[in-house]
């Protein structure tokens, strides 16, 4: 009798949970409805997330890069994000990457014009790669909170001085001004993946004993300072562009930043008032990139993208660097809901958003926007097809989560299954 009563209570609780979920979904905004992002109004709530592009061999905008972003814009996204626009030459991830300088503005203007012609907005992801930067190909010493070895670049990053930190903040402000001049609608400040700001946030990497190390409040000074430097620059220009940030919820590394510390950081960023939205991400480009990507770990293919001896080292240690995490739809939602419950500002859900069901779920959970990457790499027109399908839920992504696209990030990023975006023209 007792067991029957408990079973009945369990069924009632499950039914109540389903009813609440259905009620939320019924009252949630339509992902295809227009939405405000700071001063912008996007035509829908779907953003193409920033990804490696490898389409700038001379560190300047090419027709290839323009087409790479024009395709998802024509394919229906509300906004596409150009990555990675470093704030300085030494802040690039590798030597062919674009950095924000006057010579880059005309090319960026051609890009933003092309995106606007398709009815979409366009954001520039700006940041300093810090210890992730390839000092050899950049021909500039990388920076980190402390002297730190980059296993990919096979070089040490030097400890950033106070003058270095001031310079990086000034570079972010200048990058924002150049983005405005180039016609961008938004800038996204990279605070994740153990790039410079994220490295300062990480207790594993940041072992400083000065005002930028030790307590979380000290470790967060660089991230908060960068955001406010950009905000002041944007406000001074009187520009109506949005300012967002990409923030790690967790590094996925023992000793790295966790959700509790990251949530506290997010609250500070919210209270500072410099951001119009935060895109929630995870993982470390230095130690554990698959914590962000999930799915198959393409060790053989990724190793093949490097020259010996790094190729051999990657093959021998690849299982440790490219750890395999099972894929599931909306795989960052569990952690993201912790942030949604505590923050009032707009949040962007990333990770495993591949179909209408996951988009609707994100809206029901209170997220203002969703961000997609691999699914749009595989099918740049996916959003238009989902929109045409309506609420039938009959359109699913061609992305298989094989992650072999990761092996192409240094040689024109593309989907090796569909051939897109090259074969989507």
Specify the residue positions occupied by each region the protein language model found.
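Flavin-dependent oxidoreductase catalytic cores
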Residues: 19-425
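N-terminal amphipathic/basic-hydrophobic helices that include classical n-h-c signal peptides
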Residues: 1-24
């Amino acid at each position: 009798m007792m067991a029957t009563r408990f079973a009945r209570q369990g069924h009632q609780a499950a039914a109540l949970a389903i009813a609440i979920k259905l009620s939320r979904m019924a009252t949630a905004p339509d992902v295809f409805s227009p939405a405000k992002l700071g001063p912008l109004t996007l035509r829908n709530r779907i953003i193409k997330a920033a990804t490696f592009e490898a389409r700038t061999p001379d560190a300047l905008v090419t027709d290839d890069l323009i087409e790479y972003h024009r395709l998802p814009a024509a394919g229906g996204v509300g906004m596409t994000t150009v990555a990675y626009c470093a704030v300085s030459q030494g802040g690039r991830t590798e030597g062919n990457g674009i950095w924000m300088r006057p010579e880059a503005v005309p090319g960026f203007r051609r890009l933003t014009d092309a995106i606007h012609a398709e009815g979409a907005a366009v954001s520039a992801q700006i940041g300093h790669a810090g210890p992730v930067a390839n000092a050899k190909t950049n021909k500039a010493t990388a920076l980190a909170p402390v002297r730190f070895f980059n296993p990919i670049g096979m070089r040490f990053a030097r400890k950033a001085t106070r003058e270095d930190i001031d310079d990086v903040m000034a570079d972010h402000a200048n990058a924002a001004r150049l983005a405005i001049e180039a016609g961008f609608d938004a800038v996204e400040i990279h605070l994740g993946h153990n790039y410079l700001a994220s490295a300062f946030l990480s207790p594993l990497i940041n072992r400083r004993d000065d005002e930028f190390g030790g307590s979380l409040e000290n470790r967060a000074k660089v991230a908060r300072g960068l955001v406010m430097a950009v905000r002041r620059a944007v406000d001074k220009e009187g520009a109506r562009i949005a300012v967002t940030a990409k923030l790690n919820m967790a590094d996925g590394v023992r000793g790295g930043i966790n959700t509790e510390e990251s949530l506290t950081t997010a609250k500070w960023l919210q209270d500072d008032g410099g951001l119009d939205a935060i895109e929630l991400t995870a993982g470390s480009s230095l130690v554990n990139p698959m914590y962000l990507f999930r799915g198959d770990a393409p060790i053989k293919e990724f190793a093949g993208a490097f020259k010996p001896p790094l190729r051999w080292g990657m093959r021998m240690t690849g299982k440790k660097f490219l750890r395999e995490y099972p894929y599931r739809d909306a795989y960052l939602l569990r952690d993201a809901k912790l942030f949604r419950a505590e923050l009032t500002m707009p949040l962007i859900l990333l990770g495993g958003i591949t179909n209408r069901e996951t988009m609707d779920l994100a809206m029901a959970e209170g997220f203002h926007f969703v961000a997609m990457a691999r699914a749009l790499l595989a099918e740049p027109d996916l959003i238009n097809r989902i929109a045409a399908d309506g609420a039938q839920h009959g359109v699913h992504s061609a992305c298989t989560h094989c992650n072999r696209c990761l092996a192409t990030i240094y040689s024109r990023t593309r989907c090796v299954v569909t051939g897109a975006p090259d074969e989507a023209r």
